[in-house]
From Swiss-Prot:
Primary role: F(1)F(0) ATP synthase produces ATP from ADP in the presence of a proton or sodium gradient. F-type ATPases consist of two structural domains, F(1) containing the extramembraneous catalytic core and F(0) containing the membrane proton channel, linked together by a central stalk and a peripheral stalk. During catalysis, ATP synthesis in the catalytic domain of F(1) is coupled via a rotary mechanism of the central stalk subunits to proton translocation. Component of the F(0) channel, it forms part of the peripheral stalk, linking F(1) to F(0).
GO MF term list: proton-transporting ATP synthase activity, rotational mechanism; proton-transporting ATPase activity, rotational mechanism
Record HAMAP family: ATP_synth_b_bprime
Membrane topology according to the record: Single-pass membrane protein
Disulfide bonds: none
Domain of life of the organism encoding this protein: Bacteria
Organism, as annotated: Clostridium novyi (strain NT)
Family: Belongs to the ATPase B chain family.
Transmembrane segments: 7-27
Record keywords, A-Z: ATP synthesis, Cell membrane, CF(0), Hydrogen ion transport, Ion transport, Membrane, Transmembrane, Transmembrane helix, Transport
Cellular component GO terms, alphabetical: plasma membrane; proton-transporting ATP synthase complex
Name under which the protein is recorded: ATP synthase subunit b
Length: 159
């Protein structure tokens, strides 16, 4: 093979021209696309980092709200428990008062019934005594008859 300098120079010039044309039409647009894609990826990464930070802030805020709501719920439950205990104590107190009133009424009723029974017994005793005296005066009584009358009187008083 022959080496010719003019061919070699023309080949180098052609190669350089091809490089310039390729650089202008191929390498430059490809580099621009790659640069644009790199910037897009960096932007996406930065946006993802920002979104992650926001999500973390929201998670913390939600966690704090949850804790506050849980604490508030606990306070509400405790308040209702206290109110329920107060109502329960009030109901029990009212029931005790009502029971005392009923017991007092029952005692008064028993006392009235007792007084009534005593009055009736007293009247019955007087009646029986008068009847016994009447019978005693109507007959002449010996000791045996007197004992029978007393036993009859006691049995009537017992009934």
């Amino acid at each position: 093979m022959n080496f010719s300098i003019p061919t070699f120079v023309w080949t180098i010039i052609n190669f350089l021209l091809l490089l310039v044309v390729l650089s202008y039409f191929l390498f430059k647009p490809v580099n621009e696309i790659i640069d644009k894609r790199s910037k897009d990826i960096e932007g996406d990464i930065e946006q993802a980092r920002i979104d992650k930070d926001k999500a973390e802030e929201l998670r913390i805020a939600n966690e704090e709200e949850y804790k506050a709501a849980k604490k508030e719920g606990k306070i509400i439950v405790e308040n209702y428990k206290a109110k329920a205990e107060n109502v329960s104590e009030e109901i029990i107190s009212d029931a005790h008062k009502e029971a005392e009133i009923i017991i007092e009424r029952a005692k008064k009723e028993i006392q009235r019934e007792r007084e009534k029974a005593e009055y009736e017994i007293k009247n019955k005793t007087i009646e029986l005594s008068l009847e016994l005296s009447k019978k005693a005066l109507e007959r002449s009584i010996d000791e045996k008859m007197h004992r029978e009358l007393i036993e009859e009187f006691i049995s009537k008083v017992g009934n």
